[in-house]
Each structure stands twice: as C-alpha cells, then as structure tokens.
Curated annotation (Swiss-Prot):
It comes from Pyrobaculum aerophilum (strain ATCC 51768 / DSM 7523 / JCM 9630 / CIP 104966 / NBRC 100827 / IM2). This is Glycerol-1-phosphate dehydrogenase [NAD(P)+]. It catalyses: sn-glycerol 1-phosphate + NAD(+) = dihydroxyacetone phosphate + NADH + H(+); sn-glycerol 1-phosphate + NADP(+) = dihydroxyacetone phosphate + NADPH + H(+). NAD(+) binds at G84, R85, P86, I87, D88, T106, A107, A108, S109, S115. Catalyzes the NAD(P)H-dependent reduction of dihydroxyacetonephosphate (DHAP or glycerone phosphate) to glycerol 1-phosphate (G1P). The G1P thus generated is used as the glycerophosphate backbone of phospholipids in the cellular membranes of Archaea. Pathway: Membrane lipid metabolism; glycerophospholipid metabolism. It is an enzyme of class 1 (oxidoreductase). PANTHER family: GLYCEROL DEHYDROGENASE, GLYCEROL DEHYDROGENASE 1. The lineage of its organism: Archaea, Thermoproteota, Thermoprotei, Thermoproteales, Thermoproteaceae. The keyword Transport does not apply. Substrate binds at D111, D160, H245.
Amino acid sequence: MKQLESFQIPRIVIFGPGAILKTPLVVSELKAGRILVISGKSATTAYANQVAQLLSNYSVDVVRYNEVDLSKSSYDLVIGVGGGRPIDMAKVYSCVHKKPLVVIPTAASHDGIASPYVSYTLSQKLQTYGKIVASPVAIIADTSVILSAPSRLLKAGIGDLLGKIIAVRDWQLAHRLKGEEYSEYAAHLAVTSYKIAATNARRIRNFTREEDVRVLVKALIGCGVAMGIAGSSRPCSGSEHLFAHAIELRLQEESSEAVHGELVALGTIIMAYLHGINWRRIKKIAEIVGLPTTLKQAGIDADMAVEALTTAHALRPDRYTILGNGLSREAARRALEDTELI
C-alpha cells in the first residue's frame, strides 16, 4: 500500500491582458497586512512599483531581489514581480518565513513562474536554509506585460518546454532501473506542455500577439502543477537541465549572455540523441523558433560542452538520468558531432 501523499499547487491563477490590475482582489483574499514586493534591477522595477500603487491600502515595501533581508520576518505576504531572480528570491523568503507567495511574472522564459522550486545555482548558494520549496498560492500573469518582454526570453520559454520530453524519459528510466517513485499524471502534464510547445512553435514563434504568449504561459503553468503533484522537479528537469546547469556553473565567472531556456534546448537535442528519440525533429523545432542550435550560436566553447557532459551527472547524484555515471569525453564529443552542435 502506498503512503499518504500530499502536494501543493497554485489555487488562484489569473492570466490575460490587464491581469496585473487584479492584484488587489487576490491580496484581499489572502488577508495580508504588511506586504513585501520583490523586484528586479531593470525595467521590471516599474511593474513592481505599479503593484505597490495598486496596493496603496496596505503597508508595502518594494525591495530589489539582491537587497532582500532574509532575517526580517515582519511581512504577512511576499510578491515576486519580474523574471527568474526576483521570483526565486520571493520563493526563498516564502519558504524561510512560511509566508504565502504570489508570483507576477514579467517574462515567460522558464517554468519557474509556477514551480515550487528555485534555480539550481541559487539552491546551491542557499544550502544553509535547507531545501527551498514554496508553491505560489497565486499566479498573476499579465499577458500584455509578458508580450513586451524581449522575444529572446519568450523563445527561451519554448526551449525550456522542449526539455520536458527528456525529463519524463529520464524519470521513466529511473523508475524502471532504480525503482524510483513515478507519477503518471505528473508525467502526462509535463509531456502535454512539451507537445503544446512542439505543435504551436511555428504559429507563436514571433510572439507578436497576446494569444501567442497565452499559449506559452499556459504550458509553463502546467509544468508548475506537474512539479507540485510529483513533489519534486522530476517531471520537468532531467539530463537536459543537468547539462544546462553544468554550463551555467562554468559561465558564472564570465560575462556570458547565455539564457537558461536556450541551454536547455541544446541539452534536449543531445539527450534526445542519447535516448534514441528523434533529435532531428526537436532540433528543427528549435530552428523554427529561432533558438540556438549549435554551440557557436549559443556562445559556448566545444571543450566546455564536453566537460559539462562528462560531469553533469554529478550535480544531482540522487537523480538518475540517461547520463548514468557520466559520459566519457569521447562519447560526449561524438554526441556533439553527431547532432551537429559542433
């Protein structure tokens, strides 16, 4: 008999043009007094200030993500407004102080807008706080705001979605070979998000219409729900993400402009090759969208990619994937050559 299961998923989701104006309605349901709004450092700060103005009946502090004082626990609610970093820091604050979390994304470049988990690199920096898990109680996705984000970030969102087919294949492999717990429902949600990206790629690739963003946001929110049901990021993060994380760790010391979803798309092509999936189709979808499909286009050195492929498995030794105990340098280079990434 299976043990008792529990999971947390967002209970309020509002998306569409002008959705940000519904923020006071959402907050009123959460009965908050003091509110911390965490913003980015760029143009997205304007949206955080707009949220603060909409909540003028409350006591609101707007703080940039890199200036948040995690020792301060006097807020009743935390709202993350912006891209990955402010939303991740809002999750950290929510988790550390057990406060409800509202997410208001200004871009849709990855599934972090709806997931309970923070980026790998941030989780490594904050290990003293333990495992960071904070599911948003509400997501307010204003598609008119997200539509104004750089198209590169929106295309990266498709890249992140393409990776779900690999994450689920890795999960199934771990279930068969290692006896890992597997949720068919969570896996189905993740694969559905992949299919939405794959089948709509040509239609939405330019992101010139609100409905293009709506398709992307729905799929990314579906991924967040899948992770909430699974109780881990397993259905949405496999070997393709390990490769991306390995590259990101190596680029930390450089002034790289690499975008997470772009790296995931490259990792997806490589891991599809290793899994025996039709990697050419995935690469074609990436080309249609306008994602990098070679290491050169992504600004990544071939030796760095080889090194990432041989060490990525060690980033999460508890997560079995197609990488197994690691690729040899010869196998890694062959995979890059056969998929024409180099």
